[in-house]
Regions:
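Generic beta-strand/beta-sheet core signal
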Residues: 1, 31, 63-65, 113-117, ...
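Domain-scale activation on soluble regions of proteins
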Residues: 106, 111, 152, 180, ...
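Hydrophobic anchor at the start of a short beta-strand
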Residues: 112, 160, 331
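Short, compositionally stereotyped local motifs that mark structural "simplifiers"
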Residues: 275-348
Length: 348
């Protein structure tokens, strides 16, 4: 009986699907009351934990991202639910689930959180009821044609946190270089990607395409969804997923110095340059670069494992020219093919 109380699957479900993580059976069957019983039980237990600590549980993040297409297509129980509730398709089934769970949370004085999928492509009637129940929705998949997602969410009434993969996914590799570990499905994310994010002009937050080619930011918003409710852009958030993490040194390497730009955009959502005047961007970037360079000295003193970018080099008129990313950096070299050390000759 207890097992039936929390049953979350359809024994006769023949749906065939594959999730982004290559699973074939990782979706709850929301036609079963056991799903709701389980979710409500988890919320109750969380409330008890918070209460034991002398706190009130204010927000529960529901997740809700990347539900694979086809996950309910061949479930007799879902078909029966759709007929009983007058639901037309799987998207309306998900709306039914989100509406019920957020209503339950609201009755307990708890706000919901979720990834962008929970707030996309719903009718105004749904948004009018459900959006006020959310404390935050994270906009994450913002590459290319999906760059308008943060503004679609905000305009629909959802409190939106910019969690853009193109700017704030810390586990993306710094560059394409073989020595830079990390993922690259959403592009590359270095210490400048978070810094040049523009929460209130989000289309200019992507200054380079996947191949590193500079984009025309002055034209990036043409024909795209405008931000009509800026009050619903409530913050920025960095993500560090653990698929590629092997030790804490790697955590530090991914985060430092990327998080300086994230922190700056959290405090100052409107960058200090004018994209119509390229010289102001260059000056602002140089100023940021100098500040980061100073902080690296502090990180080094404290023993953190941070990344220093590769030096640049080119041969011009038979002479090797070398530069560095941050002011004051020294480049050590050898002439015998051995690995340079701190005691090797310094390039001047």
């Amino acid at each position: 009986a207890m097992a039936e109380q929390y049953k979350m699957w359809d024994d006769n479900d023949k749906s065939v699907y594959t999730s982004a993580q290559s699973y074939h059976d990782n979706v709850l069957n929301v036609a079963h009351e056991g799903v709701f019983n389980f979710v409500y039980k988890v919320v109750d237990e969380l409330e008890k934990m918070w209460k034991d600590a002398g706190l009130k549980l204010d927000i529960v993040h529901l997740g809700g991202d990347e539900v694979p297409k086809g996950s309910w297509d061949a479930s007799p129980d879902i078909q029966a639910l759709m007929k009983a509730k007058g639901l037309k398709d799987a998207h309306e089934v998900s709306e039914y689930f989100i509406s019920r769970v957020t209503e339950h949370l609201a009755q307990k004085g708890i706000k919901a959180g979720g990834w962008q999928e929970v707030g996309l492509d719903h009718p105004d009637s749904h948004n009018a009821t459900v959006a006020p129940r959310f404390a935050m929705v994270n906009a994450w998949s913002t590459v290319g044609s999906r760059a308008n997602i943060p503004y679609r969410l905000a305009n629909a009434g959802y409190p939106t946190i910019l969690s853009n993969v193109t700017n704030f996914y810390v586990d993306m590799a710094y560059t394409w270089h073989q020595y830079d570990k990390g993922l690259h499905w959403g592009g590359y994310c270095d210490e400048y990607a978070s810094w040049f994010a523009q929460p209130y002009d989000v289309y200019r937050s992507e200054r380079y395409d996947y191949n590193g080619v500079a984009l025309d930011v002055l034209k990036s918003a043409e024909g795209k969804t405008p931000l009509q409710k800026p009050e619903n852009i409530i913050g920025v958030q960095g993500q560090l997923w653990s698929e590629t993490i092997r030790d804490f040194d790697q955590v530090q390497y991914y985060m430092l110095p990327k998080i300086f730009g994230l922190a700056l955009r959290g405090w100052d959502a409107k960058p200090e340059w004018d994209d119509a005047k390229p010289e102001t961007y260059i000056a602002a970037r140089a100023n940021y670069n100098a500040k980061v360079g100073k902080e690296l000295g502090v990180l080094n003193m404290l023993g953190f494992n941070f990344r220093i970018g590769m030096p640049g080099a080119k041969v011009e008129n038979g002479k090797l020219l070398v530069n560095t990313q941050y002011p004051g950096e020294k480049v050590c070299y050898t002439l015998d093919g051995s690995e340079p050390t701190a005691s090797s000759p310094v390039w001047t």
